[in-house]
């Protein structure tokens, strides 16, 4: 079985996790693609290609061509911008024998549009931070402001007063204003099969965050979070591996966002016992995967650090460039 991972960038841990999953379960190759030969994770995959940048026809033909050339059975998008692109075409890939780990287009849209996600949560009875429809509705500072379609920590701000708020509202395209919550923040790695049955849930507390990613984290068997995350996943119709963020505030779960893809620190959940890459491989092979809710090491820590990779320019040039004409 061969797996294609897109936009691998520096996601070395994720590439290695799927190599391990294949080795344990069935054998095969992890094939990595990116638009830049300077992407570290390319050099850890079994095979790598440079593909056209942008989500256009050239990119699509290159991806489809690689899938056909290398007999790919599973495709894993890893970048937010790719999710609506692959959600829209996943049925056509099924016809060539490729399963894409992505939910339906409407689910992706609800997750990526932060205002839609807030309304969805309210409609279905899930708590979210207090959201102000208009700046004059703000009753207390500080508040938190973010872009409606923002990604990660980009364009997110803590705002201390009305003057700062007015300044940011003038600069941002489509801002959302919420209460500022000072409370433990959790990322939940939730995995569901392709029918939406939740198989694994691991909350991990974000103890130190840099650039929107958790660099020090700790797993937590907080059952209130586990149960609410399962209910949210079923309401949204999530499939595959998902990254859910929430606060534990005033003895309540308050959801922030859902990213229907692998997150940067998912390897903490893998190490604690919820090895979802192997679960995903088994599902694609048509094997039964039993739910393992709560079966992970509690209070297990991740301390992330930077590791350097040194390669020559010649090695960089050896990565094959896969262009549209090769895919036809």
Language model region names:
Residues 157-237, 247-248, 252-254:
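Phosphate-binding site of ATP-dependent enzymes
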């Amino acid at each position: 079985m061969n797996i294609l991972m897109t936009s691998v960038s520096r996601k070395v841990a994720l590439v290695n996790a799927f190599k391990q999953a294949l080795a344990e379960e069935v054998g095969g190759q992890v094939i990595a693609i990116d638009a830049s030969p300077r992407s570290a994770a390319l050099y850890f995959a079994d095979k790598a290609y440079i593909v056209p940048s942008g989500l256009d026809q050239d990119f699509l033909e290159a991806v489809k061509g690689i899938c056909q050339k290398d007999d790919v059975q599973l495709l894993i998008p890893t970048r937010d911008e790719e999710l609506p692109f692959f959600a829209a075409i996943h049925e056509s890939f099924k016809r060539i024998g490729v399963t894409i780990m992505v939910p339906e287009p409407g689910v992706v849209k609800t997750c990526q549009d932060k205002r839609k996600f807030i309304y969805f949560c309210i409609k279905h009875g899930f708590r979210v931070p207090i959201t102000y429809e208009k700046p004059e509705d703000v009753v207390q500072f500080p508040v938190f402001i973010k872009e409606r379609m923002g990604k990660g920590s980009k364009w997110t701000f803590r705002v201390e007063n009305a003057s700062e708020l007015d300044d940011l509202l003038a600069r941002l395209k489509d801002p959302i204003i919420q209460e500022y919550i000072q409370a433990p923040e959790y990322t939940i790695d939730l995995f569901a099969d392709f029918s939406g049955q939740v198989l694994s849930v691991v909350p991990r507390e974000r103890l130190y965050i840099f650039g929107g990613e958790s660099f020090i984290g700790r797993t937590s068997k907080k059952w209130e979070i586990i149960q609410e995350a399962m209910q949210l996943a079923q309401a949204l119709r999530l499939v595959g591996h998902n990254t859910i963020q929430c606060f534990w505030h005033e003895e309540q779960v308050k959801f922030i966002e859902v990213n229907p893809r692998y997150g940067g620190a998912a390897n903490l959940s893998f190490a604690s016992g919820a090895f979802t890459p192997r679960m995903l491989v088994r599902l694609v092979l048509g094997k039964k995967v039993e739910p393992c809710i709560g079966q992970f090491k509690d209070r297990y820590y991740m301390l992330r650090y930077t590791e350097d990779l040194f390669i020559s320019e010649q090695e960089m040039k050896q990565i094959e460039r896969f262009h549209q004409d090769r895919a036809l």
